[in-house]
Amino acid sequence: MLPFEAARALVIETLRSRAGVPESRFATAETIDLPRDPRAAIGRILAQDVAADRDYPPFNRSTRDGYAMRSASVAEPGTRLRLVGESRAGVAYPGTIAAGECVRILTGAPLPRGADTVVMQELTQTEGEFVLFEQAARTGQHYVLAGAEARAGEVVIPPGTRLGYAELAVAAEVGQARLKVTRRPRVAIVSTGDELVALDARPGPFQIRNSNGVSLAAQVALVGSEPVLSASAHDEPAELRASIERGLEADLLLLSGGVSVGKYDLVEQTLLDLGAEILFDSVAIRPGRPTVFAWCRGKPVFGLPGNPVSTMVTFELFVAPAIELLSGYLPRPLPLFPAQLAHPIHEKGGMAHFLPARVTWAAAPSDRERAPLTTPVVETLLWEGSGDIGAVARGNCFLLVRESRPQLEAGEWAAVLPRRGVL
């Protein structure tokens, strides 16, 4: 069995070496009209350079409300200068400041010619047409030089960037109204098992609805890809083979169920019959040990366990970085963060455990008298094993218990994996 970190690294390396991602995705770009529909750009991966069309700021820009002047004019506290005009955002003072003069200036306004500093209004008093300065002025205060943020032609957003509101604001600022973004990869989802029925069907006494298909489609969408949800496949070789072949028309194929070692677990053998290379089929985690990663007909294929909590965990660990690469994005490291345990943990060693949990921000159990109310505290939830999706829904994260430290005490720090889209 592979440690989950090694399995995740193998997925990333395989996608990079065999599919040439993320760079190869820039060639299949789509164009988004930003003024028409900025929502369409959120979460997309940029497939071009976005460069500054001029210097930013394009002028020396005040960062405070106050008065602009020559600093030499206020060498001593108590100096009075004649107020000769105003500079505000969008309207510059038209003249040049001379010695003994000052100009009222507002935040975001151009620094007048001749001025080399701005004094905040809190340090002044107005006396008719004069302004009294309570402190001596210093050169270069409270303004930003033209071009300090970006020079004309400088790349301000590189390709491969995931677009959020700040990136879209930068694109708008530099006049990039149309953005090239990578095509969203299509992810085929096939749930397997004779026990599955459609969501709108009434299950028989020993049947269940196909919740895995829905949860996987939601996870695929949260990563920024396009889910293609197929009908479930029965545990029958010919039907499963046909479902896999149809799924290989997408950019990535996800199968859930049928990956263990039972009589009706047919996924791995069917993939081999189709010429697939199995890169791993067992990972040292619980839940999620019987996870398959394969390469078939030039496409990545994942066989995830059928138990729904296993499916959720293994998707985040292994499938999410593959989709990010196919989107043209270098996957981020697994977003673990530390939290203090609300209670002891006693698990078996030999593999890593991902336990449904909830993190809150409160006084830590080891220091409730003095701890600030910002300490993340995590507690696991009662659950009935990897089929208990209700436990995951009641939580907002998974607690990682590493194989090297299966026994943990209350108050110790442990790693938490946030549930995507919730925490």
Task: Locate the predicted segments by residue.
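Helix-rich terminal scaffold detector
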Residues: 1-5, 177-304, 308-314, 365
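Intrinsically disordered, low-complexity, positively charged segments
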Residues: 1-78, 163
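Short, glycine/charged-enriched hinge/interface segments at domain edges or termini
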Residues: 2-5, 50, 65-234, 382-383, ...
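Flexible glycine/proline-rich
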Residues: 2-8, 22-34, 38-39, 48, ...
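Predominant activation on well-ordered alpha-helical scaffold segments within soluble catalytic domains
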Residues: 8, 12, 65, 121-122, ...
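Short, basic and Ser/Thr-rich N-terminal targeting/leader segments
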Residues: 39, 44, 52, 62-65, ...
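Short glycine-rich, flexible loops that bind phosphorylated cofactors or substrates
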Residues: 112, 165, 261-263, 310, ...
